[in-house]
A protein has these predicted regions:
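ATP-binding N-terminal substructure of ATP-dependent carboxylate-amine bond-forming enzymes
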Residues: 1-82, 86-88, 92, 111-119
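Glycine-rich phosphate-binding loop of ATP-grasp-fold ATP-dependent ligases
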Residues: 13, 105-107, 131-156, 176
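Short, hinge-like loop/turn segments at secondary-structure boundaries
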Residues: 70, 94-98, 123-126, 150-152, ...
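Structural detector of well-ordered beta-strand residues that form the stable sheet scaffold
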Residues: 77, 105, 133, 167-169, ...
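Short, glycine-/small-residue-rich phosphate/pyrophosphate-handling segment
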Residues: 89-110
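ATP-grasp fold ATP-binding core
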Residues: 97-98, 124-143, 163-177
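Phosphate-binding site of ATP-dependent enzymes
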Residues: 149-192
């Protein structure tokens, strides 16, 4: 059971791992391992049959740990390398959705070193109305996601300065529903 890691989602990963371990230990021998500098040594030492990936965010959901495990020929839970990388990249995902005629909010991608206040506001006004949603392109669990008005846009963009790329998209109000899928089977829908 791999968890923790270095991402902004470390704490939620540890909570996930705690719940997973509680359930799996009833029927399986579990070794919990932090995704840290000793990860490769632990793989060698414990020779796992399968890795349950409880990592969240960078390194855990972006194809990184998956590529390590595939190179070591270790089975794991989670999507594969390419699907993980594409799912974690919000712009790549949106382009795939559009190509497959799946509706997705309109968006603008900005390099953070190229944030020009007037340019951003002009582009937003041209494409859609306020409020807008801003977020880093490669984070999950709603980390650093803001719903912005014209008044607080620049202040919130400043909070995202640590990210290389930022996504600004139209805000669509309503309920948020998550659907789990395993293979081609829908496991159920949950309102968040």
């Amino acid at each position: 059971l791999v968890a923790g890691g270095y991402s902004n989602e470390r704490e939620i990963s540890l909570k996930t791992a705690k719940q997973v371990k509680k359930i799996l230990k009833k029927n399986y021998k579990i070794f919990k391992c932090d995704f840290d500098k000793n990860f490769l040594l632990n793989l060698k030492k414990f020779k796992p049959n399968i890795i349950f990936n409880a990592l969240h965010g960078r390194f855990g959901e972006d194809g990184f740990v998956q590529s390590i495990l595939e190179s070591k020929k270790i089975k794991y839970t989670h999507s594969g390398v390419l699907s993980s990388a594409l799912a974690m990249d919000k712009v790549a995902s949106k382009e795939i959705f559009k190509k497959n005629k799946i509706l997705t909010p309109k968006y603008i991608k900005f390099e953070n070193n190229n944030l020009n206040k007037l340019n951003i506001k002009k582009k937003i006004k041209k494409l859609f109305n306020f409020p807008v949603v801003i977020k880093p392109i490669n984070e999950g669990s709603s980390v650093d996601v803001f719903i912005c008005t014209k008044k607080n846009l620049m202040k919130n963009l400043f909070k995202l300065k640590k990210y290389k790329e930022v996504l600004i998209e139209e805000y669509i109000g309503g309920r948020e529903i998550q659907v789990a899928i395993l293979g081609n089977r829908k496991l159920g829908a949950i309102e968040l």
